[in-house]
Amino acid sequence: AAVKYSKKFFEDVEFYPEDAGRADQDFLCKMVEEVIKAGATVINIADTTGYNLPEMYGKKIKYLMNNVPNIDKAIISVHCHNDLGLATANSIAGLQNGARQFEATINGIGERAGNTSLEEVVMALKSHPDLNLDTNIDSKKIVPISKKVSRLMNMPIQRNKAIVGANAFAHSSGIHQDGFLKNRDNYEIINPEDVGLKASSIDLTARSGRAALKHRLELLGFSFSKVELETIYINFIEMADEKKLLHDEDLYELMKKYK
């Protein structure tokens, strides 16, 4: 009745079967069939408690696609929660099995542990073009929008948050830094410019190696021999042990004795 009533006012009527993630498959199919008959155009399959594993959720979507006679008259949408940290994986599993809409939020904001992270799904699909699930979203706006939402909602972004966290494109381990400087593809699958950043960053810490230090010093205009670099590196490590993260002003201070 609610769907029929809504249809009097709106062409697009979306129906949410609450806790569909744990619902009986056949009961869910009958319900979906009836609401489509009543005029629903989108069926949001809600994993309300974040209970499902990706394989379970994907099978649920596939079962609906194969067992609801009038499923072609509506769009199946996925709506996942992150209670087990699986909202992104579950959403992608749903899309792989026939869903053609996913509901998500910037930075994964949402009830309890949050909802599906928009930026994660967008970049996962972009990184796997073989899935043929292009969102047509301008990914270069991801980081600016993420920062704006964080500021307006007064909700800091976790530093190691995928895609938009401060550490997402930062390299601090010496081995990683050396490999990254030789070929970015060694340690990055996403170009930072694709999400609205100017570049990746090399964080200089006590874990950094000679390659990263040499790279940064040369960018600052310093020149030195290979032998001199060894002495500079020893002093750098001593400073890094004390200050944890070194900035350009620290490097200028470090290099005063080598002018």
Q: Where do the model's predicted regions map?
A:
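General structural feature for long, well-ordered alpha-helical segments within catalytic domains
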Residues: A2, Y16, D24-M31, L53-K60, ...
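Short, ordered loop/turn segments at secondary-structure junctions
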Residues: E18-A20, D47-G50, H81, I106-G108, ...
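Acidic side chains
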Residues: D19, D47, D83, D241, ...
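A mid-to-C-terminal "edge-of-domain" accessory segment
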Residues: M123, D130-K259
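Alpha/beta enzyme core
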Residues: A1-I76, I92-A99
